[in-house]
Amino acid sequence: VYKRQQVYTAAATAILMIALLYFLGLFGALIALLCRPVMGFLFYLFQLKKAAFSISFFGGFRFDLSRLKDLLPYIFMSLLAVGLVHVVEIYLRGLISTRIDLHSAGLWTAMNTISSNYFVFITAIFSLYVLPRFSENIPNFKLLHEAKSILKTLLPLVSLAMIAVYLFRKPITKLLYSADFISITTLFKWQLSADWFRVIFLVFGYYLVAKKRLIDYVIVELFSFSVLIGLSLYWIDAFGIEGVVMANAIRYVGCLVLVVFLLLKKLGR
């Protein structure tokens, strides 16, 4: 259910974002970002109905409590992640508007939108490839070997794609927006660095999801957004919006270290 919900949400968001970007520009991208959690929630309700209810011989519905209990950890993790992401994004947009100006907030949103656009496909690949492998009964001592195997397969492809995005950052910016947004090209190095570490972090993070490690998941999520907000507040006056994007990169480095530490602790190493 979690896997299907992620894939459906990713595909629907990508289509909606491309369409709204084409017709409405940056305003359309903002609408698409706001619609993403709504679409995710609706897809989840649909999948939950299919999983938790079964059709009887008389055409009615029979509630299956045991299957619903299995879904609750995934529902909680999805709602926590989606809720925190959008609350923090709104806060940071307001912070940039207050500390710098509205134009800078628009530039930061534009950079965020580009990142969200290509990361939609990365998330879909992870949901199809990584989550099923970790959902299998993998012994704890084989976890690191499995993670290494996944990274050896996916990371080179992701790295090449990100290098291509960086090399063509100016044409991409002009295609999606206009020459007025060309100044965001200076942010690409930090955003792509953040997303590269995010990919590695997600390999281990998806293990927490697959194994329903709720406490560890909550710890990592709260740490993630605390670092992002704290460093953004600290760096925004010195570096402007680049400081916020730098904070995002450091955030995922820290998350990677934390999640590996938690997993090694679980393995007794």
Predicted regions and their residues:
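Hydrophobic alpha-helical transmembrane segments
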Residues: 4-52, 223-227, 241-265
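Membrane-interface junctions at transmembrane-helix termini in multi-pass inner-membrane proteins
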Residues: 3-5, 193-220
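Interhelical loop/hinge segments that connect adjacent transmembrane helices in multipass membrane
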Residues: 4, 33, 44-89, 137-145, ...
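Interfacial transmembrane-helix starts/ends
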Residues: 72, 109, 142-156, 164-168, ...
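Interfacial segments at transmembrane-helix termini and the short loops linking adjacent helices
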Residues: 102-103, 148, 167-196, 242
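Residue-level signature of transmembrane alpha-helical cores of multipass secondary-active transporters
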Residues: 70-82, 86, 90, 94, ...
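Helix-loop junctions and terminal segments of transmembrane helices
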Residues: 54, 111, 115-140, 207-210
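Interfacial/gating helices of multi-pass transporter permease domains
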Residues: 29, 66-78, 95-116, 182-185, ...
